[in-house]
Amino acid sequence: MKENIESKNIGNRKFIIELRYEPKVTMLDSKGALVEKIQETRVFPCTHWEIGQSEVVIRDDKKKEDAHNVVLVTLNRMSFISYKVDSVESFYASFSKVYEAVTKVLSSLTITRIGCRIIGTYNTKSNDLRMFLRTFKIRFLLNFY
């Protein structure tokens, strides 16, 4: 996976990879094992985890709003979210470790959908929307196409 967005171009990045798969009912009996296996990956310091009726949430802070890394596993979905990304490669490597841990516990998954989002904020020097769009087009879009 090529690093196609330089860190200097994006501030406050949020990366999300989400897998949807056919429901794995065995997940209900394996929630504790999921937490342990994901913690063993050491992709981030797991300081807080929650086990709900049909989900496991692991994050690097007790307060949801202060967390930089979050893993969510449900009956039919796995999400890996990070606000602290050094590169696309490092994010994908961390996701791969978490995915491997999940499949060790739940065995094979029949994936029905995969999605990836990168959300970022951009500093502006003008309040004028037309000026902003022109600048955005010049600085951002033309650099990647």
Predicted regions: what is each one?
Residues 1-5, 113-145:
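Aromatic/basic-lined ligand-recognition segments
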Residues 1-82:
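N-terminal low-complexity, intrinsically disordered segments
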Residues 10-12, 74-77, 96-98, 121-125, ...:
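Generic ordered-secondary-structure signal
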Residues 25-27, 88, 124:
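Residue-level signal for secondary-structure boundary sites
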Residues 33-40, 93, 97, 104, ...:
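Charged/polar, solvent-exposed surface patches and flexible loops
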Residues 44-57, 104-123, 144-145:
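Short glycine-rich, low-complexity/disordered patches
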Residues 69-71, 92, 127-128:
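Short, conserved acidic/polar surface loops in the N-terminal third of protein domains
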Residues 74-120:
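Aromatic- and glycine-enriched beta-alpha-beta binding-site module
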